[in-house]
């Protein structure tokens, strides 16, 4: 039976320092730093005991307003090895990060530490980068990460479809919803670009534009879905980063066209912010939600990004993120059925200086 961990306390300092000195040759955590981590609100330092004595620890760091947590350090006293304590500590660290609202745990490990690397790979971590000359002795660090899903397996019958272009997250989300509600729906890259052409804002930064909520709503209705739009701002969207007057004018004209077509349709638009109940009630009635987020907390870049909300565990929303970063060996399994805590997701679901919130609530049947 797994041994539970507990928060470290001041009386553990001698043992923690001893473990550190025995487990690592360089880059050791000092007594002073251990004490500081115990008091830091954005850190979780837990120990595991064997026969009444501290046998190991993990240290997880949380970054505010981020979906990521970092396993800063993990160690087992050499005299206590061989009892599976490393695995228990790793699993406890993952659970702590997940319960802290994070759904990705990252770590660094020395490239010359095959035992630790094997442990991480065994438990589903994937290598996604390298830090050169990272440690005090100039050894490189390998970077690993794992998507956290908590204790319960999240099952979904909503198909997953990765976007094929950088600017087609919105169409990919809509196609997933269409494939869920319409089993005979044919989805492919041609349809993806067709939806993008119908709903694009024309420009975004220096490249092709992403898709706006009104254009996507019209595309959804055209394909037989019933949709309701929640939008926190009236008027043109996504203009904060557009410096060219010519581009701004074209974007404003395109969005004026969307608004005029929405006004002559029967698509309801409510100009207010999305809230928790909007999503939970939609999901409870069998609907899905396309939600605009800032990609910064997930992808590290400040761009608008559409995701599809497909489920609710009671504490977490479950999403399909259409972006798969193949350059770092991601697969669709890494990006589908992601559980994100309610509070973290609502924090992510806004973009830009004005805090734009946009959401499409989509259903197979007419809305009540």
Predicted stretch roles:
Residues 239, 244, 248-321:
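Active-site-adjacent substructure of cysteine-protease-like catalytic cores
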Residues 148-248, 256, 272-273, 315, ...:
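Active-site-adjacent structural segments surrounding the nucleophilic cysteine of cysteine proteases
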Residues 108-109, 121, 126-143:
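Conserved catalytic-core motifs of GNAT/GCN5-like acyltransferases
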Residues 43, 139-143, 356-357:
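Short hydrophobic/aromatic beta-strand or adjacent loop that forms the aromatic wall/cage
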Residues 284, 288, 294-296, 300-306, ...:
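Noncatalytic regulatory segments and standalone regulatory/sensor domains
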């Amino acid at each position: 039976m797994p041994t539970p961990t507990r928060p470290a306390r001041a009386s553990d300092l001698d043992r923690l320092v001893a473990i550190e000195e025995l487990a690592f040759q360089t880059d050791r955590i000092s007594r002073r730093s251990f004490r500081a981590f115990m008091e830091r609100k954005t850190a979780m330092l837990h120990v595991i005991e064997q026969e009444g004595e501290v046998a190991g620890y993990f240290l997880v760091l949380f970054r505010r307003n981020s979906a990521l947590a970092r396993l800063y350090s993990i160690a087992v006293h050499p005299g206590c090895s061989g009892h599976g304590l490393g695995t228990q500590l790793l699993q406890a660290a993952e659970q702590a990060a997940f319960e802290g609202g994070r759904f990705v745990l990252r770590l660094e490990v020395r490239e010359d530490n095959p035992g630790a690397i094997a442990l991480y790979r065994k438990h589903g971590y994937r290598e996604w980068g390298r830090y050169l000359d990272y440690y005090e002795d100039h050894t490189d660090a390998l970077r690993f990460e794992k998507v956290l899903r908590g204790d319960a397996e999240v099952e979904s019958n909503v198909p997953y479809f990765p976007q094929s272009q950088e600017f087609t997250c919105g169409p990919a989300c809509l196609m997933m919803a269409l494939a869920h509600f319409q089993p005979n729906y044919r989805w492919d890259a041609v349809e993806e670009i067709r939806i993008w052409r119908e709903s694009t804002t024309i420009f975004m930064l220096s490249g092709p534009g992403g898709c706006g909520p009104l254009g996507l709503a019209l595309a959804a209705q055209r394909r037989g879905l019933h949709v309701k739009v929640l939008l926190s701002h009236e008027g043109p969207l996504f203009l904060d980063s557009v410096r060219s007057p010519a581009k701004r004018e074209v974007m404003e004209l395109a969005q004026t066209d969307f608004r005029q077509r929405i006004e002559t349709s029967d698509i309801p638009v409510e100009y207010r912010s999305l809230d928790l109940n909007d999503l939970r009630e939609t999901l409870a009635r069998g609907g899905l939600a396309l939600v605009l987020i800032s990609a910064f907390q997930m992808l590290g870049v400040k761009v608008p990004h559409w995701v599809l909300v497909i489920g609710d565990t009671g504490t977490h929303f479950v999403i399909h993120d259409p972006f798969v970063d193949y350059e770092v060996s991601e697969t669709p399994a890494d990006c589908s059925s992601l559980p994100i805590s309610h509070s973290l997701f609502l924090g992510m679901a806004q973009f830009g200086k004005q805090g734009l919130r946009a959401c499409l609530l989509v259903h197979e049947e007419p809305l009540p």
